[in-house]
Structure formats: C-alpha cells, structure tokens
Amino acid sequence: MLEFFIEEKLLEDITMKEELLHQQTGINIQEKANLIWSIADSIRGLYKPHQYGEVILPMTVIKRFHDTLLPTREKVLEVYEKVKHLEVKDGFLQRASGYVFYNISNFTFDSLLADPDNIEENFLAYLNGFSENVQDVLKNFDFEREIRRLANNDKLYFIIQEFNSEKAYMGPDKITSTDMGYIFEELIKKFSESYDEE
C-alpha cells in the first residue's frame, strides 16, 4: 500500500543523500507514529477514526517533502527567478534543491501559519509550487477536497500547526527513508485497527 502514494524515485534520491551522512538516526518509530496519530485526534467528529488517513497520510508526505527541501529553499527560489522564463527548467531547479523534486512557492509551514485568514488559499498555492513528480504523488490522495473540508471546519490551521511542531520534524537528517517507511506502516496499521474497532 505504501507504493501507492510514494514514488520510488523520490525516496531513492533521499536515500542517496542519507547514505552520505554515514549514520543511522535511530529514531523511535513508534514514538513518531504515535505523535502523528495524536494529531489525528484533533479531527475526531469531523472524520471517523478509519478516515483519519485521508488527512494524516498526505500531510505526513507533504511534511516530509517540506522538511527535506527547507535547507535549499532560498537557493531554489533564487534559481527559479533566473530560469522561470525558460521552457525547460526542471534540471536547474533539481540541482538547486539537491533532489529530483523541488518547490517554487514562497510559502513554508511557518509562513502559512503567519497568515491564518488565508491559510486554505496559501496552502493550495504551496502545494501547487511542488515539482510535477511530487504533484503526481499528491494527486493520488485527492487531498484538495480534504483541505476544503478542514478549512470549512476550522481545522486546517491546527493540523498545519501540529505538523509544524519541533517534534513533528521529518527531515532526512533525522529520519531515514527506511524509518519513514516504518512510520507509514505503523500509521496504516493504526488506521486499520481503528476501522476494526468501529
């Protein structure tokens, strides 16, 4: 099921970067999965527990991409300003990001939270700033519908805020791709168990 929403080429690129670090992070998989699951509790009532995955899984993927790209964000934006008029610009932006994916939006989770009145519009603009390969991954979630639902019920800001906490950091310098895979498996298991409980 994990392959359904994460393209292998994106993970391979992150994995190559991790090998250069020459260290295992040794994070507590269960602890990180529990933290993410606790965020899901905030949408109780709006979603049934077995539906939490419709929000939590795409948000986890988005946060992973966000934290991975954050260190090279300024460089990508600088390069984008120079090449935005070109028809083919992916190679320049990929080199600037250091990955086979990038984001050209001016937003980060911090700046999204700084403008709560426009959080839905700005979050959609942030997602549209991702390279096409990431947008293809995100399309599998049909997440735009959930963003509207969260925004209409005053939950979108809170979800982004919780995913932006220091404990929810998911950059490859702290969480390897292998660990991330285990976290997803743990989350999927929790969603399945909650479905059985209903």
Residue ranges and their predicted role:
Residues 2-198:
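Non-catalytic, mostly N-terminal accessory regions of nucleic-acid modification and defense proteins
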